[in-house]
Amino acid sequence: LCFLVGVLLTTSLYAQSAGDKRSSFSVHAGPSWYLGQLMGITDRSDAYRSDLRKGVAWDVSYLAQVAGRKFQFGVGALYQGSSYKNTHDTGADKILMHYMAPQISLTMVKKHYQLQLAGGIGYQFYKDKSKVYGKPRDVSMDKLAGNLALSGEYFLTSHWGASARLNWLASSTETYSVKYHDEKWNVENPKTGTGYFGQLSLVFGLNYHF
C-alpha cells in the first residue's frame, strides 16, 4: 500500500512539470471519415459511397513552443495519413491520402493537462488504387490543402502525456488523373468545375515532451 501511494505521488509530481517542456513529439491513430466529393471511384451507389467514407487515420507531429507559459505559441510540422476502402462485385477502391504541412499552435497549459488549437497549410497527396474487373486502375491528384485541429492532453509523467486530437483537413481540385489499361487521361470535375474533398479524424496517442 505504501509503495502504491508512493508511485501515485511520484507520478503526480512528474505530471506537474510536464507542461514546462518546450518541445514535443506526438504519434496518434484512430477512425477517420472522408468528407466532400468522392471523385473517380468505381461505384456511385449511395450504400457503397457511405461505407467507403469510413476509414482510419494516423499522424506524426513535432511542435516547439516558442513563446508564453500559460498560453504558449508554437510552431512545428505535421504528417497525417489515412486509408478508405470498399469492394463490390466488379471492382474495388482503396483511397490513400498523405498530408504534410507546417503548423502553428496556441496551447493553454494547466497543472495536469493542456488544450491546444493548431492549424496549417500544406500539400495533400491523393491516390485511389482501385480495380475494375480485376484490372488495376489508379486515380490520383496532388493538391494544396489546409488543416485545423483541436486536441487535449493529460500529463502522465514529466515527459509523457496521453492525448486525443480532432483534425479537419480540406482541399479542392479541378481535375484528377486516371490510369487504366496502360492509358492515362485527366478528368475535369463536373458541375461547378471544382470539387471539395477532405477528412475528419479523431485520433488517440502519446506525446513525448523534452
Predicted regions, residues:
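Short hydrophobic "helix-edge" motifs at membrane interfaces and signal-peptide entry regions
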Residues: C2, N147-L148
